[in-house]
Amino acid sequence: MKKITWIILLLLAAIILAACQANYIHDVQGGTVSPSSSAELTGLATQ
């Protein structure tokens, strides 16, 4: 059971990192900075 939970945690971390990277690329290309749900999840919006 522990191996399954580790796989799920790794998948969640990868999804959050990918979403933040996509938002960062979008912000750089568009020039607009808007707080997104993924940024709030990782705590970037509060900084």
Curated annotation (Swiss-Prot):
The keyword Endoplasmic reticulum does not apply. It is found in: Cell outer membrane. A lipid is attached at C20 (N-palmitoyl cysteine). GO terms for biological process: cytolysis. A lipid is attached at C20 (S-diacylglycerol cysteine). It comes from the Bacteria. Residues 1-19 form the signal peptide. Coiled coil: none annotated. It is a lipid-anchor. The keyword Cell membrane does not apply. Keywords: Cell outer membrane, Lipoprotein, Membrane, Palmitate, Plasmid, Signal. One of its GO terms (cellular component) is cell outer membrane. Lysis proteins are required for both colicin release and partial cell lysis. This is Lysis protein for colicin E5. It comes from Escherichia coli. The lineage of its organism: Bacteria, Pseudomonadati, Pseudomonadota, Gammaproteobacteria, Enterobacterales.
